[in-house]
Amino acid sequence: MKFCYRLSMGACFALQLASVPAFAQERLTPEEAGRPLVSEETAAEKQDAAKAEVNLKPPESHNWFDDLEGHIVVEAGVNGNPWTHTGRNWAQSYVDRANTATLNQITGTLSHPVSDLGDGYGLGFVFEVLYGSDARFNPTIGMGDGNLTGMYQWAPTQAHIDAHLPWFTKDGVDLQIGQMYGMQGFEGTDALERPFYSYNYSSDFIVPFEVVGVTATVHLAEHFDWILGVNAGNSTTFGGAKNNSRPKGYFGFAFNGLMDGKLDITATAYLGPQQSVYAIGREANHAMEYIGDLLATYKIDDKTSVTLNGTYFHDDYLQDDVYGVTVYYAHDFYPWLTFNARGEVFRDNNGGVVGNNIGTMSYVNELRGRNYAYDYAPGTTYGELTVGVSYRPQFINDNLAKGSLTIRPELRLDKSLNGTRPFNRTSATDTPGVGYADKGMNNMFWFSCDAIWAF
């Protein structure tokens, strides 16, 4: 979210994991995260298999629709911040309500993997809808925004056709056409696409949440992809739902499976004007916004990985530079227990980006170019340290009829590193609905826990 007395609008979030994949975020169950699903056959087992009776009858006919998949993810959480005077956690979007239990998301997905159509062509799709408090920050203007206006809203989050084309290079091109998650950043919207309940600053305030357009991944070599995309902008569509008349798009490269499969690196830029003509007029067509994102994940061994995510943002209209570096560490103590740690340093030069949307429709109205209620702070260098675990209780999961349960407690400390005091208190300003966070605390210690049921 962009917070500015000029009522501006810009790009904020989004989502990939270790590298930019060919298609939209795949839903991962906890058991799949970096662990083998089956063990390798022994020599004796291979001999027994060779002796097995062979069925020469023709297989039953298999059509394209047999591979349809449906998934549901339910996430609810609670957080505690006994020191707040505002009832909110400063600089948080999805986990903004302090000392409150929240139904964050019920996400339903219907998808089909990209399947061979013959002659090297493939076709698939993803349709996804989200209901819950998270939908406040995942709207796409022109696609059902404003149908619900309270704490709990709904939003279509993915609606794209996926295709593989045997064009240009030996390994061809992968296309996504339609509505999709933004591809920058490490922390995804889906609860299982991030290691923590809370988000880092870059995911909340810089990288795009949703885009509508076309994204192409050109496989130039075995470990090297070229990424290109054009879209309507962050969380907007076309016609009266656009932010301005200029296109926006991605450009970048991905290096996958380097160092014997241990290292993935992705570097992308997202470019184009993102301000709304309904807020600032025709200047919105020319005020450029630049977002650069570097993501590198190194797998130390089968149980341990380290990820580095660096992000830079500049907006010509806001005249603000925002940038940050986040380091993630993950270690599997057991198949059912993962330790996660995250450290971040994040700078908002003039305070035009980091803040809090106050109303349940604040972010939607910001995207629409309308007045909205928000709090902002002076330019601040933020530090953040989060530790937690992902616990998949075997005694529950072994007895569930469907899916699996993941519980993620976390402890988090946010701190101002340059002497400002934006946390836990705001002051009224002369502008109705706008608060200024400058007389609070220089740190915020809080704790959270969410539970995820995925099936």
Model-derived segments and spans:
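N-terminal periplasmic/intermembrane-space "pro-region" immediately following the signal or transit peptide
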Residues: 2-90, 368-372, 455
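Hydrophobic secondary-structure block in the mid-to-C-terminal portion of proteins
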Residues: 11, 241-247, 433-436, 440
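Residues that define the transmembrane beta-barrel architecture of outer-membrane proteins
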Residues: 66, 99-106, 152-157, 208-212, ...
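Outer-membrane beta-barrel pore domains
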Residues: 27, 94-95, 138, 146-149, ...
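A generic structural signal for short coil/turn motifs at secondary-structure boundaries
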Residues: 117, 136, 236-240, 276-278, ...
